């Protein structure tokens, strides 16, 4: 008899939906388990078989936890803002809201076909105004806050205003002004100062501009779009930024609070990129008209300062125009133009040939003022990282070495060691050639020399010890229509203010007919003339709304909180419910989000923690990345390769339980695995064997016998209970399924069908293959759904083996084995071994020189 999967799966999916089987009792007194998938972007292509891998894993664990007595929160929603829907609208004229809704409907249909136990009453979409009302609310809180470096936390901007009123900028790393001066500043002057502290601010910066997309890209997004074939160039624009760098230390330090894959922790650490060293000013040889006294650089190797032979400034550094001599102006401007067309990714490519141009100007080495240092520009230095300038020590830095060799610049060793065709950058050797009338560090090691240089620079007030981060502030504006409107208004007076919170959500203008970027660097919202105009409710002043929208990452920064309380119209989440359910106990999703979504959401969560609206420092306690599922050709699934497998086709032919079981049986969850249609067929055959185990005869009637199980049958059962019960929480789904298969293989040949044993087996199968399990449970006479049943507990008495297997070696080579009582004595074990037929034949006529016995495991007979 073949398992009628289509009929069974259709029935139970409808049953679960109608009975709301998986709705969370959010105020339950049971222990909680919050199990979350990274919600998908609903693309037009729909799901492929790679998507259900992570969803199935979390579903198995969610079902298991319910059976273990937990109240489980397992929701699903849609990260639905983004470029693809808008680009489709530009091509077809169909509004992004329409295509997004259609895509969501298709994704939901596909996900429901898999039989996943989501609480659909909590479904959300980042494009829903009722949702992004609170995305905008969080944005306003960020805008109205600053990061207090003394307390290392965010505070209301009002506390900063009060501070300025009381003591000016004292005790802050900022240009000095007194309390009296603050009070005399105009509103615009005050706002300019406050914007230097706000967690959301505007800045004129070189951005990653994609002409084809008509928008800027965050640093973290560039590689993805270049890989898709888009050209990304650097272009100066005024953009909204989020001051994520203020949280760099906490983002790094608090990684110790989470249980995440070591590779992801390492990626975040590297992206944040903490380094300690010296920030020091190299004075100009000739004073500039602007009065600037020199160029600041940051170095992690103060001990090599005597080895500086040139300086490199980023081509886009504002100082370049001032320091370029008339003779070098044309070359410098040509180089600036060429470098502006390159992305940061291109510029940081280590293997590319070094290029650059001399500016014609010099600085002096502060540690050795008689040493003139030529100033060059080169695109391997980025203005957005550090100070935008470096001291070049070619003897002890590989990139500097390659640049110096290219342009014939001096290479001066100041650390003991041999320079061949690579720079020598040891931290274990001592300093040489490092002495002047200012200071000497000759003979000192790295640590001592660095400390001495830093102390000297601080005493001279030309430098200071500093901690620096590779992390840069988050470019938060996009020149697109399909994103959350930024709830700010710009007024002719020069002031920018958020709209009142009572007016949230600020919705997108629905009747916009043109979705293409304006071509001026503004978003299509600039074309919505009526929507643009805003009258300040307090002053009556007419302002213009901000036309940029938020990036796709905004909505995903906090969605895990909204699932807890999705219908609350007043708060993004009830405080008591947040305290009960946070943090997320398990978060599953792709490793590609390690330095995007995961970093951004941690940043927002820490801010929300600072302002007292969440109770945990980290949002996700445990994180797992599922491995990619490749095509059958072992290449990444892609339309262009024609190797995409649609789950609809698999479910239509083999059923959802087959898809679920196979994806979990392919191998460890985190591994990359190729798809195999033959593998699905094998799992489908297994489910049919399970079905036949419970059915018998030509009439295919259901059969379970009210008979006492044998001891052997109970041993098989309880061994399976223990194995499956241990493997599920450890995500060892493949070995758990293997044990279920062993169980079926043990029982299939027998004509016995003990109800106690086989009913328990159904409970073990349920998290993996819920449709067939529900059907078998119902047919065995149970009226309630499996979702309310308890997971079986293994009985220790059936896990104890009464016999042990002992192997027999002769001269160290395996010759035979036998079973013996667990408490067999050494003498009896050796006697049994000697009397085995194989062993007797080998020993015939030989002398046993030694008998070695490893209790309960091994006997080795040494013969001569």
UniProtKB/Swiss-Prot annotation:
> Which InterPro entries does the record match to this protein?
aa-tRNA-synth_I_CS, aa-tRNA-synth_Ia, Leu-tRNA-ligase, Leu_tRNA-synth_edit, M/V/L/I-tRNA-synth_anticd-bd, Rossmann-like_a/b/a_fold, tRNAsynth_Ia_anticodon-bd, Val/Leu/Ile-tRNA-synth_edit
Provide the top EC class: ligase
Positions occupied by motif 'KMSKS' region? 636-640
> Single GO cellular component annotation?
cytosol
Q: Which CDD domains match?
A: Anticodon_Ia_Leu_BEm, LeuRS_core
| Top-level taxon in the UniProt lineage | Bacteria
What biological-process terms (Gene Ontology) are attached? leucyl-tRNA aminoacylation
Q: Is Ligase one of the keywords?
A: yes
Concerning Pfam families, the annotation shows: Anticodon_1, tRNA-synt_1, tRNA-synt_1_2
Ribonucleoprotein keyword on record: no
List of residues binding ATP: 639
Chain span(s) of sequence motif 'HIGH' region = 40-51
Q: A Gene Ontology molecular-function term?
A: aminoacyl-tRNA deacylase activity
Catalysed conversion reaction:
tRNA(Leu) + L-leucine + ATP = L-leucyl-tRNA(Leu) + AMP + diphosphate
List the keywords (alphabetical): Aminoacyl-tRNA synthetase, ATP-binding, Cytoplasm, Ligase, Nucleotide-binding, Protein biosynthesis
Q: What is its main location?
A: cytoplasm
Which PANTHER family did the record assign? LEUCINE--TRNA LIGASE, MITOCHONDRIAL, LEUCYL-TRNA SYNTHETASE
- Classification via NCBIfam families: leuS_bact
Q: Which family does it belong to?
A: Belongs to the class-I aminoacyl-tRNA synthetase family.
Protein name as catalogued: Leucine--tRNA ligase
Q: Which organism is it from?
A: Leptospira borgpetersenii serovar Hardjo-bovis (strain JB197)
């Amino acid at each position: 008899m073949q398992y009628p999967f289509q009929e069974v799966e259709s029935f139970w999916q409808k049953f679960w939906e109608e009975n709301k089987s998986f709705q969370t009792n959010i105020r339950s007194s049971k222990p909680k388990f919050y199990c979350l998938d990274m919600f998908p972007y609903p693309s037009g292509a729909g799901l492929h078989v790679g998507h259900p891998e992570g969803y199935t894993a979390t579903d198995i664990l969610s079902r298991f936890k319910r059976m273990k007595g937990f109240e489980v929160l397992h929701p699903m929603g849609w990260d639905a803002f983004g470029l693809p829907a808008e680009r489709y609208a530009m091509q077809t004229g169909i509004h992004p809201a329409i295509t997004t809704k259609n895509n969501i409907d298709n994704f939901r249909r596909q996900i429901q076909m898999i039989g996943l136990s989501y609480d659909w009453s909590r479904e959300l979409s980042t494009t829903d105004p009722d949702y992004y009302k609170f995305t905008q609310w969080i944005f306003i809180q960020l805008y109205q806050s600053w990061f207090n470096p003394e307390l290392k936390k965010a505070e209301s901007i009002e506390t900063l205003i009060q501070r300025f009123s009381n003591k000016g900028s004292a005790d802050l790393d900022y240009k000095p002004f007194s309390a009296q001066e603050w009070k005399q500043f105009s509103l615009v002057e005050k706002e300019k100062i406050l914007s230097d502290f706000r967690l959301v601010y505007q800045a004129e910066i070189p951005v990653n501009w994609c002409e084809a997309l008509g928008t800027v890209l965050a640093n973290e997004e560039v590689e993805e779009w270049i890989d898709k074939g888009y050209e990304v160039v650097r272009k100066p624009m005024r953009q909204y930024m989020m001051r994520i760098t203020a949280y760099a230390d906490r983002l790094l330090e608090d990684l110790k609070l989470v249980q995440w894959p070591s590779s992801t922790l390492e990626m975040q650490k590297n992206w944040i990129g903490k380094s300690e060293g010296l920030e020091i000013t190299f004075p100009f040889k000739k004073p500039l008209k602007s009065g600037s006294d020199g160029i600041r650089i940051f170095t992690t190797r103060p001990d090599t300062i005597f080895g500086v032979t040139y300086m490199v400034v980023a081509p886009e550094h504002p100082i370049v125009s001032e320091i370029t001599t008339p003779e070098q102006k044309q070359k410098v401007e040509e180089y600036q133009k060429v470098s502006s067309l390159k992305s940061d990714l291109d510029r940081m490519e280590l293997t590319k040939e070094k290029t650059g141009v001399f500016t014609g100007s010099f600085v002096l080495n502060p540690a050795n003022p008689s040493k003139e240092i030529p100033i060059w520009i080169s695109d391997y230095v980025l203005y957005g990282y550090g100070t935008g300038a470096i001291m070049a020590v070619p003897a002890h830095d590989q990139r500097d070495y390659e640049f110096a060799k290219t342009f014939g610049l001096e290479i001066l060793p100041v650390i003991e060691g041999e320079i061949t065709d690579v720079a020598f950058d040891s931290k274990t050797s001592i300093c040489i050639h490092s002495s002047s009338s200012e200071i000497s560090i000759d003979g000192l090691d790295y640590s001592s020399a660095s400390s001495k240089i830093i102390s000297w620079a601080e005493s001279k007030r030309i430098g200071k010890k500093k901690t620096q981060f590779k992390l840069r502030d988050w470019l938060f504006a996009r020149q697109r229509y399909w994103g959350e409107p930024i709830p700010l208004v710009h007024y002719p007076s020069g002031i920018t203010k958020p709209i009142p919170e009572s007016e949230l959500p600020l919705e997108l203008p629905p009747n916009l007919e043109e979705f293409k970027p304006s071509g001026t660097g503004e978003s299509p919202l600039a074309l919505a003339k009526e929507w643009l105009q805003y009258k300040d409710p307090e002053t009556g002043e007419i302002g213009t709304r901000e036309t940029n929208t938020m990036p796709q990452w905004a909505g995903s920064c906090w969605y895990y909180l909204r699932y807890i309380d999705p219908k609350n119209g007043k708060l993004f989440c009830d405080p008591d419910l947040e305290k009960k359910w946070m943090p997320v106990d398990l978060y599953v999703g792709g490793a590609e989000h390690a330095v995007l979504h995961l970093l951004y959401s941690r940043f927002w969560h820490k801010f929300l923690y600072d302002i007292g609206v969440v109770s945990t420092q980290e949002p996700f306690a445990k994180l797992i990345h599922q491995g990619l599922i490749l095509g059958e050709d072992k290449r990444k699934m892609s339309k262009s390769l024609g190797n995409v497998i649609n789950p609809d086709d698999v479910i239509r032919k083999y059923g959802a339980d087959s898809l679920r079981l196979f994806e979990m049986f392919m191998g460890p969850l985190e591994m990359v695995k190729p798809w195999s249609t033959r593998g699905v067929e094998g799992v489908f055959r297994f489910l049919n064997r399970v079905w036949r185990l419970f059915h018998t005869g030509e009439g295919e009637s259901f059969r379970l016998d009210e008979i006492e199980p044998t001891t052997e049958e109970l041993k098989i059962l309880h061994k399976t209970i223990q194995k499956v019960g241990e493997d599920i929480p450890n995500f060892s789904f493949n070995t758990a399924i293997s044990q279920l298969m062993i169980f079926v293989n043990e029982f299939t040949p027998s004509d016995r069908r003990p109800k106690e044993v086989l009913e328990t087996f159904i409970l073990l199968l349920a998290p993996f293959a819920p449709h067939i399990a529900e059907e078998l449970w119902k047919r065995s006479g149970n009226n309630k759904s499996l979702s309310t049943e308890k997971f079986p507990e293994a009985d220790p008495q059936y896990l104890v083996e009464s016999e042990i297997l002992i192997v027999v070696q002769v001269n160290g080579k395996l010759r035979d084995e036998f079973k013996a009582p667990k408490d067999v004595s050494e003498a009896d074990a050796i006697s049994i071994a000697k009397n085995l037929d194989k062993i007797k034949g080998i020993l015939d006529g030989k002398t046993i020189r030694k008998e070695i016995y490893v209790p309960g495991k091994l006997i080795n007979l040494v013969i001569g």
